[in-house]
């Protein structure tokens, strides 16, 4: 039996709807996931690999200095009063060099190189980098703290060395131009021939003090970031490429060939998470991210906070903090022992940086309240001082990131050195940095074209086809129903007939009464 044309159309529309449902809700997600697995892995000649090797735009590197306004009082034991100056804005360009792929275990090795360019136009109003700030002397306080911890009896001799190296300092503070401290370097005079200065300078050179370069005529140059600017980091990092398993993409598995650190205790020496420049796709709100920071020798585990959006793209915000080492069992292995952990919100960096520094969030956000009480002039704000990253969850792309950390030092109080015998002995801030990322319009458009536009097109098409199928189904049902009604109305069936047949009379003539339809004549009754 041949189908009528309207019914054929209806069935065709239902077929289109069924295809839309199967493709849009079943096949396309599988295809998209498969394609993303290929695109997000660190395969050669992919966009992700190219951006991973050399980020094609500058990151925002901002430095905020703390200027101390009551030095004389601090030297007598008073609480420090500080005033924040900044930001001093730098364009930071990142690249990876000496890259080698290892197909056998799906890994890749590389070294890092960063470039910094000062941007007065993006810095705080009127800041040129030539401003002189007053702050605790990093070298003198660091050396005094190390000697006090290891050989306190040597503090007196160290004081004599300071007199020679730093020209009879009157206090434990430095007056220095910001750019000199950050990058250009400050000169340390190690040309003195007296025993104490010479012994200290020899020890500095032998130990290879952090941030120190050595120049002719026994002149040392110290800066916070100068050695990083344009210099290849000597450490060789090994990460997973994610070709075999995209969920492992960027995961750090070794540094300098070692599969774990020898800095901390137990589990804290393990490399957990990615290198911080790439993350796995298909993130959900329940996923806790992990990234390893080589600068701080530890992993961070940001957690989901809330839904956000950036340039029209839906994102998930993740946040992190330094942690509470004393009360978090997972973090106690960063301490010499559980009873020797620093206060909440502080991390001791001595073993990592070989300097008696402490990391915290800026302005002691999420830290022990006593830290704020010991310093005047701080005002923590979660929006201004927290760590936050906004991810596009399907691709795992960081759209906006603000990584912030503050460096602190103890104003050491020790009787055996005149310069520090009356200091308050409390933790105090030095400076804090923000490393920021915000994808520009070009890369947001690229992400939309590669991911969201195809997804939206399929979304529209699948609903359109599903709608067409629904219309076809309804149309077919209506057509079938109407056809049956028409056939029923045109069928040759009679109206209902009622007959009454009484007994035959004596003349054998029938006596009946019949009603057929709507008769125009009255019924005839034969007696």
From Swiss-Prot:
GO BP annotation list: sensory perception of smell
Residue intervals passing through the bilayer: 11-31, 457-477
A GO cellular component annotation in the UniProt record: cytoplasm
Subcellular location: Cell membrane
Extracellular-side segments: 32-456
Tissue: Principal component of the olfactory cilia membrane. Localizes to the antennal tissue with two to three fold higher expression in males compared to females.
Coiled coil stretches, renumbered: none
Residues exposed to the Cytoplasmic side: 1-10, 478-527
Alphabetized UniProt keyword annotations: Cell membrane, Disulfide bond, Glycoprotein, Membrane, Olfaction, Receptor, Sensory transduction, Transmembrane, Transmembrane helix
GO molecular function: scavenger receptor activity
Membrane topology annotation: Multi-pass membrane protein
Glycosylation sites: 67, 229, 440
Pfam families associated with the record: CD36
Cystine bridges: 268-333, 297-352, 335-341
Superkingdom of the organism of origin: Eukaryota
Function field: Plays an olfactory role that is not restricted to pheromone sensitivity.
UniProt family annotation: Belongs to the CD36 family.
Name the record gives this protein: Sensory neuron membrane protein 1
């Amino acid at each position: 039996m041949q189908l009528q044309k309207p019914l054929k159309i209806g069935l065709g529309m239902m077929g289109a709807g069924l295809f839309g449902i199967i493709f849009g809700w079943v096949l396309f997600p599988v295809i998209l996931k498969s394609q993303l697995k290929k695109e997000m892995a660190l395969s050669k000649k992919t966009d992700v690999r190219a951006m991973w090797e050399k980020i094609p735009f500058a990151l925002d590197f901002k430095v905020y200095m703390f200027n101390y306004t009551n030095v004389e009082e601090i030297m007598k034991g008073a609480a420090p009063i500080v005033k924040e100056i900044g930001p001093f804005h730098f364009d930071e360009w990142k690249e990876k060099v000496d890259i080698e792929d290892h197909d056998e275990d799906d890994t890749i090795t590389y070294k890092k190189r960063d470039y910094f360019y000062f941007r007065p136009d993006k810095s705080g109003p009127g800041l040129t980098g030539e401003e002189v700030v007053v702050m605790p002397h990093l070298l003198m306080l660091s050396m005094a703290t190390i000697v006090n911890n290891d050989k306190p009896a040597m503090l007196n001799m160290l004081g004599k060395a300071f007199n020679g190296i730093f020209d009879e300092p009157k206090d434990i503070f430095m007056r220095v131009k910001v750019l000199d401290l950050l990058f250009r370097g400050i000169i340390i005079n190690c040309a003195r021939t007296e025993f104490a200065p010479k012994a200290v300078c020899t020890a500095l050179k032998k130990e290879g003090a952090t941030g120190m370069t050595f120049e002719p005529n026994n002149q040392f140059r110290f800066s916070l970031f100068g050695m990083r600017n344009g210099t290849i980091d000597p450490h060789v990092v090994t990460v997973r490429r994610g070709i075999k398993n995209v969920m492992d993409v960027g995961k750090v598995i070794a540094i300098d060939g070692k599969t774990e650190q020898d800095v901390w205790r137990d589990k804290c020496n393990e490399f957990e998470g990615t290198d911080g420049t790439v993350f796995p796709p298909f993130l959900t709100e329940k996923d806790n991210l992990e990234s390893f920071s080589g600068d701080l020798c530890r992993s961070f585990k940001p957690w989901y906070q809330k839904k956000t959006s950036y340039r029209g793209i839906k994102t998930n915000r993740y946040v992190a903090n330094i942690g509470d080492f004393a009360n978090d069992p997972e973090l106690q292995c960063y301490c010499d022992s559980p009873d020797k952990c620093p206060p909440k919100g502080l991390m001791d960096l001595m073993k990592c940086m070989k300097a008696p520094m402490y990391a915290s969030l800026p302005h002691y956000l999420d830290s022990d309240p006593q830290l704020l009480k010991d310093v005047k002039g701080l005002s923590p704000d979660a929006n201004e001082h927290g760590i936050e990253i906004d991810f596009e969850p399907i691709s795992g792309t960081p759209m906006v990131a603000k990584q912030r950390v503050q460096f602190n030092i103890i104003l050491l109080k020790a009787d055996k050195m005149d310069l520090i015998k009356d200091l308050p002995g409390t933790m105090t801030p030095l400076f804090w940095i923000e490393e920021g990322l915000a994808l520009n319009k070009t890369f947001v458009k690229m992400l939309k074209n590669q991911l969201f536009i195809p997804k939206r097109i399929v979304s529209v098409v699948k609903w359109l086809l599903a709608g067409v199928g629904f219309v076809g189904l309804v149309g077919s049902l209506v057509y079938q129903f109407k056809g049956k009604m028409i056939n029923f109305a045109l069928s040759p069936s009679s109206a209902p007939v009622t007959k009454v047949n009484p007994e035959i009379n004596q003349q054998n003539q029938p006596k009946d009464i019949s009603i057929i339809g709507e008769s125009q004549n009255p019924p005839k009754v034969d007696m």
